[in-house]
């Protein structure tokens, strides 16, 4: 009996003896890679819903989607684990999906914890600060959650109001540089009363709650900076204005009050608009849009959405909503809703999930499926927003089709929805740095960009150092579907060796300039680049959409790496100039901690510099 026949026989024996109790099941392939984790009230019935037995061979059921049928065809081992009840199965399923990240489970793996602005009113001179956790004090006032713009909002408060700029300022006995530039009222020297400072705090709260008033202040400041030819500062202010303007916290629900989190999941079929190359594949792929509205005191303070690429037939609605809610509420949230609103549909495990969330959040929140009234209107509002996201996402389907085409061209195991791109930059072996950019869901995710100071001299060793450091962080920052390198065959083999050493399943591609007469040549608009995979080389035409897409990623990481290289070089030049003025390394660091940049330091008077250097070090608390 061959190994394949033996595996099939063992699987048949196992199927005949499956338990009928509740629990979780796991599917593994011939390399013992976990494919899927699921829960079931009756394990035997659920597992057999995937499989048929024909001529003593296991085949996928006819009603399965192509993607799930492909998964079933890869199953060589099934593992089950019994639980006392369905609720325990639900807990265990979610835990295993989060920790093991099975290939075919829905991609709700990114842990999103939204920031809040808070103020501790038990302090005589409180400060506005950011948190993502519940703080242990009943004197804390929270504002949020903010899906984006929280940092810009906070910075705007400190730039425009005389607030205590650092925690250490209150404990000091002498006014610091912030008081000299009129940004701190100097409570350390009793130059402001608690009552007067409380009025400033009230102004800050008013600006948080009235973005229009804050934006008027910022726009006036931007125009003043521009008029004074301070264009860099004006550009920073412009970006801040744009970020705060985008914060979706202006809408009011006039017909109701209360605290609600609204979740609406909507399917989108992406297969209809695909390129011819995609039509050749027999998989009908879909995108789910998970739309979320966060409502506090009847006000929509923020909203967000997640694009979930998967096959609609592989998960039913209860599974999808269960995973979405467990993922969202798995960490403590400062301002919990009274109710979670989801659309009406048959949800047998609703009470189990509600009880689990109550235990998880230590609250009495309810999951409600409203059929009519104001709460139903909130669901319709979320649905309307999801439709708009669908419209925008449909416009981006060319990128999706390009990803599918790249997958098929390079024979990748999955569509590379998440891509990390790497490049190094140096000048004659000095200021050696590397950059990693991240592309997900049709966009560059700048919050996930990473810069690396490299300590090796040649480009090959620098790439090795950077990739190894990234791979060693997979536990805290999960790997993408694809690595794209600026290089060739040597870089691909290097990356594959590193990935193998950490046991990560990541595809690797490389793109490099074609060489003419031993020199890399690339003319604008006529780029001669070679794309390489593990086993093949592709010389695509300059107008090929796949090549242009990968070039866009390569150019972005090149820009990011060289910008960091120039920054390091300029910083060293400025540091050398300061050293030439007989300041020590420690003094330069101390000055930069206070002034924030060399540019600000240049404009400081000698008296201000001497004042900073004469102060004893105090660490923030």
From Swiss-Prot:
Q: Where is the GIY-YIG domain?
A: 20-106
A GO MF label: DNA binding
Q: Does the keyword field hold Ubl conjugation?
A: no
Q: Which residues form the signal peptide?
A: none
Name the domain of life: Bacteria
UniProt-listed SUPFAM superfamilies: C-terminal UvrC-binding domain of UvrB (SSF46600), GIY-YIG endonuclease (SSF82771), RuvA domain 2-like (SSF47781)
Matching entries from SMART domains are given as:
GIYc
Gene3D superfamilies named among the record's database cross-references: GIY-YIG endonuclease, UVR domain, UvrC, RNAse H endonuclease domain
Cell location: Cytoplasm
Q: Which InterPro entries match?
A: GIY-YIG_endonuc, GIY-YIG_endonuc_sf, GIY-YIG_UvrC_Cho, RuvA_2-like, UVR_dom, UVR_dom_sf, UvrABC_protein_C, UvrC
Query: Biological process GO terms, please?
Result: nucleotide-excision repair; SOS response
- PROSITE patterns, per the entry: GIY_YIG, UVR, UVRC
Query: Does Oxidoreductase appear among the keywords?
Result: no
The record's keywords, sorted A to Z, are: Cytoplasm, DNA damage, DNA excision, DNA repair, Excision nuclease, SOS response
Q: Quote the cellular component terms of the Gene Ontology held in the record.
A: cytoplasm; excinuclease repair complex
Pfam family of the protein (one): UvrC_RNaseH_dom
The chain positions of domain UVR read 212-247
Q: Which CDD domains match?
A: GIY-YIG_UvrC_Cho
Instruction: Report the function annotation for this chain.
Output: The UvrABC repair system catalyzes the recognition and processing of DNA lesions. UvrC both incises the 5' and 3' sides of the lesion. The N-terminal half is responsible for the 3' incision and the C-terminal half is responsible for the 5' incision.
Q: Which family does it belong to?
A: Belongs to the UvrC family.
Share what the entry says about its subunit structure, partners included.
Interacts with UvrB in an incision complex.
Q: Which named protein is this?
A: UvrABC system protein C
In its UniProt entry, the species of origin is given as: Helicobacter hepaticus (strain ATCC 51449 / 3B1)
Q: What's the source species' lineage?
A: Bacteria, Pseudomonadati, Campylobacterota, Epsilonproteobacteria, Campylobacterales
């Amino acid at each position: 009996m061959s190994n394949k026949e033996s595996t099939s026989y063992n699987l048949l024996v196992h199927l005949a003896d499956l338990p009928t109790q509740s629990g979780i099941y796991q599917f593994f392939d011939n390399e013992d890679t976990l494919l899927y984790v699921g829960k079931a009230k009756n394990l035997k019935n659920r597992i057999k819903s995937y499989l048929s037995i024909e001529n003593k061979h296991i085949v996928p059921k006819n009603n399965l989607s192509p993607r799930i049928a492909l998964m079933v065809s890869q199953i060589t081992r099934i593992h089950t684990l019994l639980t006392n009840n369905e609720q325990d199965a639900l807990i265990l399923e979610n835990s295993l999906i989060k920790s093991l990240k099975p290939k075919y489970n829905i991609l709700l793996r990114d842990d999103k914890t939204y920031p809040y602005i808070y103020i501790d009113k038990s302090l005589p001179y409180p400060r506005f600060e950011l948190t993502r956790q519940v703080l242990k004090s009943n004197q804390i006032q929270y504002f949020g959650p903010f899906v984006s713009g929280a940092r810009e909002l906070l910075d705007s408060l400190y730039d425009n109001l005389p607030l205590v700029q650092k925690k250490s300022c209150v404990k000091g006995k002498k006014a610091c540089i912030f008081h000299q530039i009129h940004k701190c009222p100097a409570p350390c020297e009793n130059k402001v009363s608690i009552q007067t400072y409380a009025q400033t705090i009230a102004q800050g709260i008013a600006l948080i709650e009235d973005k229009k008033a804050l934006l008027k202040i910022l726009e006036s400041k931007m125009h003043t900076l521009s008029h004074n030819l301070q264009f860099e500062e004006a550009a920073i202010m412009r970006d801040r204005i744009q970020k705060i303007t985008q914060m979706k916290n202006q809408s009011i629900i006039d017909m109701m009050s209360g605290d609600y989190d609204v979740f609406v999941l909507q399917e989108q079929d992406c297969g209809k608009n695909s390129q011819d190359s995609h039509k050749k594949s027999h998989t009908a792929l879909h995108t789910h849009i998970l739309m979320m509205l966060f409502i506090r005191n009847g006000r929509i303070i923020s909203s967000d959405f997640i694009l979930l690429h998967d096959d609609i037939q592989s998960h039913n609605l209860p599974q999808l909503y269960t995973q979405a809610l467990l993922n969202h509420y798995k960490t403590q949230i400062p301002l919990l809703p009274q109710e979670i609103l989801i659309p009406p549909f048959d949800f047998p495990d609703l009470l189990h999930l509600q009880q689990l969330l109550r235990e998880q959040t230590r609250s009495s929140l309810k999951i409600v499926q409203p059929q009519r009234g104001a709460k139903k209107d909130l669901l319709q509002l979320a649905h309307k927003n999801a439709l708009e996201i669908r419209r925008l996402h449909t416009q981006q389907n060319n990128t999706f089709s390009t990803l599918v085409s790249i997958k098929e061209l390079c024979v990748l195991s999955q569509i590379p929805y998440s891509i990390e791109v790497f490049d190094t930059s140096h000048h004659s072996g000095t200021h050696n740095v590397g950059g990693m950019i991240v592309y997900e869901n049709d966009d560059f995710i700048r919050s996930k960009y990473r810069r690396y100071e490299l300590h090796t001299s040649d480009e090959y060793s620098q790439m090795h150092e950077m990739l190894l450091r990234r791979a060693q962080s997979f536990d805290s920052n999960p790997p993408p579907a694809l690595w794209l390198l600026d290089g060739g065959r040597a870089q691909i083999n290097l990356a594959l060796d590193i990935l193998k050493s950490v046991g990560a399943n990541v595809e690797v591609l490389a793109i490099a300039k074609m060489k003419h007469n031993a020199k890399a040549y690339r003319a604008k608009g006529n780029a001669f680049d070679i794309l390489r995979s593990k086993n093949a080389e592709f010389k695509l035409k300059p107008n090929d959409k796949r090549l242009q897409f990968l070039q866009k990623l390569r150019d972005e990481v090149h820009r990011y790496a060289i910008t960091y290289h120039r920054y390091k070089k300029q910083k060293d030049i400025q540091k050398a100039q300061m050293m030439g003025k007989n300041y020590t390394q420690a003094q330069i660091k101390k000055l930069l901690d206070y002034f924030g940049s060399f540019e600000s330091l240049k404009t400081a008077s000698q008296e201000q510099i001497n004042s900073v250097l004469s102060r004893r070090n105090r660490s923030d608390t």
